[in-house]
Amino acid sequence: MPNAVARQLRSKRTRTIALVVSDITNPFFTSIARGVEDAAAGREYAVIVVNTDESQAKEIAYLRVLMARQVDGVLLVPAGNSAEPFRLLRSQKIPVVVVDRRVVVRRVDEVRCDSEAGAYSLVDHLIGLGHRRIAVITGSRAIATSVDRVAGYERALNEAGIPLDPALIRYDRFSLAGGSRRMAELLAISPRPTAVFATNNFIAYGALRALLEAGVRVPREMSLVTFDDLPEGWHEDPYLTALAQPAYEIGRRAAELRLERLAGVAQPKRQVIILPGELIIRRSSGPVRTSPRSVPDN
């Protein structure tokens, strides 16, 4: 320990990086954190993990705490579309890598999956099964992944010549409650959608629970697909068709990028690393077989 302290004093570094996520209980972010930790441990760095709960105020408060602790870098899953977090970190010369989400701030590294392309592939899969009345349940309009996944949904519909119905686009939080709440709304409209695209795993799980509780048969009466795969213990019958993101690799690459810059490895001024997702087709998506009903069976 004394040697480690001496090294920190000489280098003026704490050998600590921070990972700021929206919700560490989401298995997607848990896997990202593991990738970050493994990469950091290999270079004798420690990792601090904090949760924002998608609150921009909480995000700023935590960043101030991390600045006071003099972390050597921040890996940030932005809670919104504000440039304030980046101005704050830049004022203290703390470098940042954006993880999972797209930002418009210049000179900021990004590591993420292609949300628009992944969403497009899921909706295109549903269209290929004959669905034309496809709904989407997504997160806040202020979050880039929500915006990009809706854009992919809209592009798939447009290319297939399917008119966009604003009533089939439902915004909420990336949460179990949000998925359940918005699915209940979709079940109340007539005609119902024949398929639903959930833009993250929490929304998907909440939506699936709402369907099962309403007695709606998946996929016979309604297909359901999700961006982000569900962990093994969450799966229920039927297992969900999903766009699986390489979460561990996203975390590992983001940490490596930050640590290589700290080590002085020559790199471009800005790097945007976009990793492909994998479409996994399971039993929750099927062809249109019956007309959607306005109310479930008793």
Task: Write out the residue ranges for each language-model feature.
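Short beta->alpha connector loops
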Residues: 53-56, 77-82, 202
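Amphipathic helical "hinge" segments at domain boundaries
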Residues: 2-73, 140, 151-154, 158, ...
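Negatively charged, flexible loop motifs adjacent to catalytic sites
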Residues: 55, 82-83, 104, 227
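Redox-cofactor binding/interface segments in oxidoreductases and associated redox assembly factors
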Residues: 19, 76, 198
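Flexible glycine-/small-residue-rich
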Residues: 21, 78, 100
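Active-site-adjacent beta->alpha loops and helix N-cap segments on the catalytic face
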Residues: 81-91
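Amphipathic coiled-coil/heptad-repeat helices and related helical stalk/stem segments
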Residues: 2, 58-59, 82, 119, ...
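Bacterial carbohydrate/catabolite-sensing allosteric modules
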Residues: 35-46, 67, 90-98, 102-298
